[in-house]
């Protein structure tokens, strides 16, 4: 299956590209600069120009599925967060609807429905992500929204905890590796039981395959 990845050049996005190729999919990396091809093409990706703050039809054309793994970054202010994590995500969703990329897996965030569960410094981010999530849920696409806790760069454990609300969040208790998150994003593509599901995830004791089957 041809799968376009928004945020392909990010730390999580690169892992997603590799895992898609390993699983037999055809990953399409949406990038803002063709210079990034040198690092992404060896991961098995076709690279296409696309910027979430501009029309992205070219990047999505011919793809049957999409994974949204983009983000404005933790060092940006509320305005950039709204431009990328909210408006950019919504425009990308609309493009997928228009171009019939019916399967959509969203990398969301823990605590977006209840920002008070997290630090006040992230409330603007939670609110922006919540708006984008609701837009996806109303889009008619076959969506899955994965809401991980704090992302780490450690090797994946292959085991997670999932739930609708995993309680007040802290880095010490609500973290998860990027590798495990990428695995969940990719595996959800072919799991029909995850369609129209929204769930939080952190590191845990349940093997990823078992956790996803139980959703």
What are these regions, as identified by a protein language model?
Residues 2, 64-65, 103:
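Structural motif
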Residues 29-91, 95-98, 113, 189-193, ...:
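NAD(P)H-binding glycine-rich loop region in Rossmannoid oxidoreductase-like domains
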Residues 1-25:
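N-terminal Rossmann NAD(P)H-binding glycine-rich loop of SDR-like oxidoreductase domains
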Residues 70, 105-108, 149, 202:
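Active-site beta-alpha turn of Rossmann-fold NAD(P)-dependent dehydrogenases/reductases
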Residues 12, 66, 146, 181-185, ...:
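Non-catalytic, hydrophobic alpha-helical segments
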Residues 31, 147-152:
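Conserved SDR Rossmann-fold cofactor-binding beta-strand/turn motif
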Residues 153-156, 160-215:
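Active-site-lining helix/loop region of Rossmann-like oxidoreductase modules
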Residues 6, 11, 26-30, 34, ...:
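Conserved Rossmann-fold NAD(P)-dependent oxidoreductase catalytic core, especially the SDR/UDP-sugar
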């Amino acid at each position: 299956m041809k799968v376009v990845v928004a945020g392909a050049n990010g730390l999580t996005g690169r892992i997603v590209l590799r895992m898609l190729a390993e699983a037999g999919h055809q990953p399409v990396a949406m990038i803002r600069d063709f210079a990034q091809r040198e690092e992404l093409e060896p991961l098995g990706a076709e690279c296409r120009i696309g910027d979430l703050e501009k029309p992205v039809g070219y990047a999505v054309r011919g793809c049957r599925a999409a994974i949204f793994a983009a983000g404005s970054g933790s060092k940006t202010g509320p305005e950039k967060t709204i431009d990328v994590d909210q408006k950019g995500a919504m425009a990308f969703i609309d493009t997928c609807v228009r171009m019939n990329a019916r399967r959509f897996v969203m990398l969301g965030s823990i605590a977006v429905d209840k920002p008070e569960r997290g630090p006040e410094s992230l409330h603007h981010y939670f609110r922006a992500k919540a708006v984008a999530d609701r837009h996806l849920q109303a889009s008619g696409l076959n969506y899955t929204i994965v809401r991980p806790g704090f992302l780490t760069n450690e090797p994946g454990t292959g085991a997670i905890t999932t739930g609708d609300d995993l309680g007040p969040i802290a880095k010490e208790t609500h973290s998860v590796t990027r590798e495990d998150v990428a695995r969940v994003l990719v595996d959800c593509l072919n799991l029909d039981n995850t369609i129209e599901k929204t769930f939080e995830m952190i590191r845990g004791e349940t093997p990823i395959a078992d956790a996803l089957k139980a959703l």
